């Protein structure tokens, strides 16, 4: 019988339970266990926000926090995390400076210690929310607080597919500048919290920018758009080991099964 081609024969001494197992070479190796030195960054998109439903550009002026539905969405995620314990023991909790992200982080915080009251059986408390402007949605400049119809009337149309270097409005960011800013912020967080679990409450654009900046297949595409639909209160998880970013999950909106 002809064996598998070189590089794919991963068992030495097949049939002998005491034989050593030879791992596949680096080029085809898959890693499921978290390396001891790895950093994990869990990015949570905020729940539905007032600016999402009112059609307002939601920077510092335009953001009015979460809607009641948005709070319920985040509470659903929190309840799932309490049920699974998957973020218990996370080391730090960040949010952008925008109210919708801060509210999201505050609602999720109890799941980091596994208790709705925000304190663990051992007396520990959920980490305080650390705000970081580098995690904000694209800075809108003079567009902040305008409705999108007002934006179009004042600034005209915007085509980032054609010109990703064009600022959204005077004083605002371009798409390329935004992606680069997010990439730098994530690198800084991963370096500061090496070997830790970092939870980040942020925005759909920030998550899209992370994919553009950190996925090898998207390398060099800072001016591109991925046409994603990142759901409210969803999780996107990265693992960083020796500066290599590995995507573990995107748009995770799973909720606990109902109790019957």
How should these model regions be labeled?
Residues 2-28, 35-39, 45-122:
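Active-site-proximal alpha-helix that buttresses catalytic centers in soluble enzyme cores
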Residues 2-40, 138-149, 196, 212-260:
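Acidic, low-complexity terminal tails and accessory targeting/binding regions
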Residues 41, 91, 189, 196-205:
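Generic beta-sheet signal
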Residues 47, 204, 251-253:
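Active-site metal-binding loops of divalent metal-dependent hydrolases
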Residues 51, 111-184, 239, 249-251:
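Phosphate-handling substructures
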Residues 80, 107-111, 188, 192, ...:
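Active-site catalytic microenvironments for nucleophilic, acid-base chemistry
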Residues 95-96, 180, 201-202:
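Short beta-strand scaffold positions
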Residues 204-208, 241:
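GST superfamily/GST-like fold recognition
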């Amino acid at each position: 019988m002809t064996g598998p081609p070189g590089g794919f024969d991963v068992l030495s001494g097949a049939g002998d339970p005491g034989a050593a197992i030879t791992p596949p070479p680096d080029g085809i190796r898959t890693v499921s266990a978290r390396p001891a030195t790895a950093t994990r960054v869990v990015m949570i998109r905020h729940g539905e926000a007032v600016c999402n439903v009112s059609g307002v550009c939601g920077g510092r002026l335009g953001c009015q926090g979460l809607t009641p539905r948005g709070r319920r969405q985040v509470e659903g995620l929190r309840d799932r995390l309490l049920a699974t314990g998957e973020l218990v023991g996370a080391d730090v909790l960040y949010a952008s400076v925008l109210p919708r992200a801060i509210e999201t982080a505050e609602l999720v915080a109890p799941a980091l210690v596994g208790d709705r009251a925000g304190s663990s059986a051992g007396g520990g408390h959920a980490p305080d929310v650390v705000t970081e402007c580098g995690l904000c949605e694209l800075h809108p400049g003079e567009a902040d607080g305008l409705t999108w119809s007002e934006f179009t009337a004042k600034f005209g149309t915007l085509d980032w597919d054609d010109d990703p270097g064009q600022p959204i409005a005077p004083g605002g960011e371009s798409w390329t500048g935004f992606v680069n800013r997010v990439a730098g912020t994530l690198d800084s967080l991963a370096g500061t919290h090496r070997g830790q679990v970092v939870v980040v409450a942020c925005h759909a654009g920030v998550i899209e920018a992370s994919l553009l900046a950190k996925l090898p297949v998207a390398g060099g595409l800072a001016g591109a758009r991925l046409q994603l639909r990142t759901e409210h209160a969803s999780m996107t998880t990265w693992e960083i080991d020796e500066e290599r970013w590995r995507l573990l999950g995107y748009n995770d909106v799973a909720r606990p099964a109902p109790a019957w």
